Amino acid sequence: MAAATEENMSVAALVMSVPDNIGRSPEVEGGGAAGEEKDAATKGTVAVGDSEEDGEDVFEVERILDMKCEGGKNLYKVRWKGYTSDDDTWEPEVHLEDCKEVLLEFRKKVAENKAKAVRKDIQKLSLNNDIFEADSDIDQQGDTKEDTSPRKKKKKIKYKEDKSPDDLRKKRAKMGKLKDKFKTELESTSEILGFDVKTKKRILEVKEELKDSKKPKKDEIKETKKTKRADIRDLKIKIREDVKDNRKTKKERYIDSPLESESPNDSFTLEDESEDFLSDNKEKQNVRTAKDKTGQDTVQESIFEKHLDDLISIEEAGTRVRRKKKQPRKFEEPKEIKKLENTNNFLERKMIPKKQRNQDKGRSNPELSKLPSPVFAQTMKSLRLSGEEKGLKSSDLAEEEKERKNEPKEKYQKRYDFDKEEKARKEPKGLKSFKEIRNAFDLFKKTAEEKNDLENNSKREEISLDYKITHDNKTKDKCSLREERNTRDETDTWAYIAAEGDQEVSDSVCQTDESSDGKQPILSLGMDLQLEWMKLEDFQKHLDGEDEPFITANRIPSNLLRDAVKNGDYIAVKVALNSNEEYNLDQEDSTGMTLVMLAAAGGQDDLLRLLITKGAKVNGRQKNGTTALIHAAEKNFLTTVAILLEAGAFVNVQQSNGETALMKACKRGNSDIVRLVIECGADCNILSKHQNSALYFAKQCNNVLVYELLKSHLETLSRVAEETIRDYFESRLALLEPVFPIACHRLCEGPDFSTDFNYMPPQNMPEGSGVLLFIFHANFLGKDVIARLCGPCSVQAVVLNDKFQLPVFLDSHFVYSFSPVAGPNKLFIRLTEAPFAKVKLLIGAYRVQLQ
């Protein structure tokens, strides 16, 4: 009878532990132990409804201190009347159904705190670890909280013993339904009380909680640590002793009274104890099943002991990690309380006879450990929580160590961390030493770590404070770019065109850089220029390459000079070119790339000016015919194109595929480069290898502005040429049609001009008609073109299909007789050499009629 009573009371303790597996009052925690002592004293005299526990044990809720969300459920921290802060427990909302007024009062206070926080100014969140303490215990806030909340009673739930295993199954099903119902109710309440992490209210709420919360004193922290360690040790010893005692009692129970091992129907009721025993055969079978059951129990007890040892070792490891911290986390205490509760529940689960698992005899031994026991599930959950807690502690330690290291550098890094980050994304313009590159990499790495710290400290926020700082830095960069454009407008006419037309190109050429002393971000024009103190005269000297010389005793080899030009290191190039060393500035690599081409392809305007002033040639050609101007036009560098054109770069040079700089600019759709090249005398009618003109590439890029610009320029050239012919012949010559499109040739690009064209003669040639070749001197003044059939240029020979053509007038070499044949024709013109002449020649042939 005594054994049966103990078994039934332990079953009742298991059922009572089911709804309290999340958070339990201190009286409920001690209920199981008190019940066992009572059973030992009464020895079977307890009847249903006659014991003292049949009365209602009343616990009054004094107030609700805090709320948190764990596992999708809202838990409330409850202060019980007559108990200290050490006895506070986390209770689900379901346990507070009789205390709705207290719950509503707590929610009202939360809403009032929100309203107060909205009125305050928004300040930056501190990057320390105090953010993690926002949802910690508020044990020290007793004087700030009001005690005016009404006191309600929480009744202890009384569980009656089941009459049969069928009733137990029904009760389990009901409990499962209740759990589902509780989950839905908790989800609905969490949706109502959930904070919007995408708004600034959450930030303000965290600040308010940070201000209201107080850190526990060091003495109290030490005392709580000592008590926790002592509790863990006592619990471990108690568990092992209970397991040993349980083994002994079971063995004695099955050896001394094997007939007392009843069937599963007899294990759950007190009334069935008076029934007759089974037959002798059934008794023998029960003895065998009892022995088998003891064997299974011993196996499971060993698994259980290992399970508990692992759990306690994890807790001890957690306490070791906690010793290293300066300030312990408050929110970790509820988790440790839960671990103690879970171990107690596990112990109660172990003390219960395994008769419930005999109900399903078809299950194997591993399946027995997977029974729908809420205690076992809660224990597994506590293991997961302890693992997560351990990870949190290790991450917190790393964060604290990093903060201690970064404290003296925070002020310096706050101003420049985002500038460094943006600078690292862009292609570096200057050749830096190894130490500078390493420092920049370290600083970039630190800024990335700081971003991770911000994300870890504000997990509930999606609004990042980094956005504001980066936005401010971007506005500063834009302002500095405007100042730089204004300076260049006053000094360089070509750069004025660049800043007026193409902002994107100027942004890529003139990037913001940071000074080496770290005081103020300054502009970088391919070198370390400090424009805040540089005057206009000094800047003009810099543009002309006449600024202060740099002298060094060390010789810089040619390969390092080439690397410096490629990387945009102005100082290194300046030092090398001002030294006594003689360099071949027109040196080429395996592809024919010169230093000027490298500077032009990289958009290094300062290096390009420096090389040009030192005598580098701008019209070098690679093996495929590419020039520095073609590189600059292809890379869309407007100011670089302007510098090269001013230095005398050839505009009509063709690559091996027949493309020119004008075609490259049309491909990129840059109307400013197209206008600049056209005004310098680019030929719009040159055909590529695939018989495509610049007008074709303008159509391909779908840029209407570029297409209209080319079309209007060609129409202007044709109109000016026809008007010049009529004025020259005084309307005695009628122009019928052009033989080939009008061409443009710059005399400085060479004395030879050649072109190919197809001619289709008309079927009926009227009398007095023929074909004449005209060579005009032209000047381009913006959109205006002035042409004349005279000038200093001397035409030496005109050859058409290997036949010399004769001039019409003996005293003029600008009008020639022209006899093309049907089909393809090849024209060659030899002019006098004038490498420095800026005159442009328009060449066209017309079928004319004498009047």
From Swiss-Prot:
Single annotated GO MF: chromatin binding
Keywords carried by this UniProt record: ANK repeat, Chromosome, Nucleus, Phosphoprotein, Repeat, Transcription, Transcription regulation
Residues covered by region (Disordered): 21-54, 133-174, 240-302, 315-428
Family matches, as SUPFAM superfamilies: Ankyrin repeat, Chromo domain-like
Processing and modification events after translation: Phosphorylated in M (mitotic) phase. Phosphorylation by CDK1 promotes dissociation from chromatin.
Keyword Ubl conjugation included in the entry's annotation: no
Entry-linked SMART domains: ANK, CHROMO
Positions bearing Phosphoserine: 51, 85, 136, 149, 164, 188, 263, 267, 274, 313, 386, 394
Keyword Phosphoprotein: yes
Gene Ontology annotations for the cellular component aspect, listed alphabetically: cytoplasm; heterochromatin; nucleosome; nucleus
PROSITE patterns: ANK_REP_REGION, ANK_REPEAT, CHROMO_1, CHROMO_2
ANK repeats: 591-620, 624-653, 657-686, 690-719
Coiled-coil zones: none
Biased composition (Acidic residues): 269-278
Region (Histone H3K9me3 binding), start-end ranges: 80-87
Cell compartments where the protein resides: Nucleus; Chromosome
Summary of the function given for this chain in its UniProt record: Heterochromatin component that specifically recognizes and binds methylated 'Lys-9' of histone H3 (H3K9me) and promotes recruitment of proteins that mediate epigenetic repression. Mediates recruitment of the HUSH complex to H3K9me3 sites: the HUSH complex is recruited to genomic loci rich in H3K9me3 and is required to maintain transcriptional silencing by promoting recruitment of SETDB1, a histone methyltransferase that mediates further deposition of H3K9me3, as well as MORC2.
Subunit structure and binding partners: Homodimer. Interacts (via chromo domain) with histone H3K9me3. Has the highest affinity for H3K9me3, and lesser affinity for H3K9me2 and H3K9me1. Component of the HUSH complex; at least composed of TASOR, PPHLN1 and MPHOSPH8. Interacts with DNMT3, EHMT1 and SETDB1. Interacts with MORC2; the interaction associateS MORC2 with the HUSH complex which recruits MORC2 to heterochromatic loci. Interacts with ZNF638; leading to recruitment of the HUSH complex to unintegrated retroviral DNA. Interacts with TASOR.
Protein name, entry field: M-phase phosphoprotein 8
Organism listed in the record: Rattus norvegicus (Rat)
